[in-house]
Amino acid sequence: MRDPLSSTIKTIQPSGIRKFFDIVSEMKDAISLGVGEPDFDTPWHIRDEGIYSLEKGRTFYTSNAGLKELKIEIAKYLDRRYGMTYDYNKEIMVTVGGSEAIDIALRAMLDAGDEVIIPQPSYVSYVPCTVLAGGTPVIVELKEENDFRLTAEELEAVITPKTKILIMPFPNNPTGAIMEKADLEAIVQVVKEHDLFVISDEIYSELTYVDKHVSIASFPGMKERTVLINGFSKAYAMTGWRLGYACAPETILKQMLKIHQFAIMCAPTTSQYAAVEAMKNGDEDVAQMREEYNGRRRYVLHRFKEMGLKCFEPFGAFYAFPSIKEFGMTSDESATKLLNSKKIAVVPGTAFGECGEGFLRISYAYSLDDLKEALGRIEEFVTELRAGMDNK
């Protein structure tokens, strides 16, 4: 019998994020700091709206592009938060999480062989989605000495005549890096000069801890060449509701909608009604959760400093990315040893690209009690490793 599988799909590796999570779920007294999921419940008034929609029998398909009411609220949100104006009817669509939006944007925009510039370390979906869309990933290694920000010089160095899209993964998973206005201005100049398009993944836009998030789409001349992707999972603690959105020029959005129609039909109806409430009345919930995350962020950095573990200061998302290079182990070896010896699960930096070697991703989207216990065990681990090195 001939091989039933696509040669392309066989080149795609499973996500490295879930590997240690699956192991720790079967391990007694283990603590996972590996999954990027808020530990908060979805705020009650948002859940209540979802329940009410079910009680009212709102269980039918919505428009392929999403509920009109939700798209209107998304447009209002973008205007009040970032001063950006989008036509809810032509430039906004609701997706099954931000991940679907990434996938269909790439499929709608790429021809075979088109190059997509992907800064790494970054979210695990960008490379496989590019490959599955027929594109060619071109990796830019973000450097710790640049605060894991993308520089115009790094971008310029990898552009070729085949380059079509730049993915902007900021605030960044796994590093927590952000791009400030001055950083983006330099990138915008290069993008315009080379006539590139941008897919800006802004799922952590509400979780920034210095100033306010700046969207690359807000710069003059950039809205028409940017697909802005966001969602409800991180800011509103709605991961299981599976809801995101894409904002793009009508010419791009129409083609994204084709793929969405045939593959998905529409995003979950109940989730969309709940999201209307989140958009209307969720700002205070987001602010409270952001404040809590910021307290945890400061605590994690303080503890790393106490144990002498080098860690770049993250200003976005809810991750820390400490360096373990001093111990002479790979990221995977270090994460495995930490799990087996101290029952703490983290994610090797290499899950987010080869340039993540020498780092671990630690999520602080966990209770302070769990963080205190976990960091105590990590300190023991670090102390034992250093003692072992001294005895050699």
What are the roles of these predicted feature ranges?
Residues 61-96:
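Conserved N-terminal alpha-helix of the aminotransferase class I/II PLP-enzyme fold
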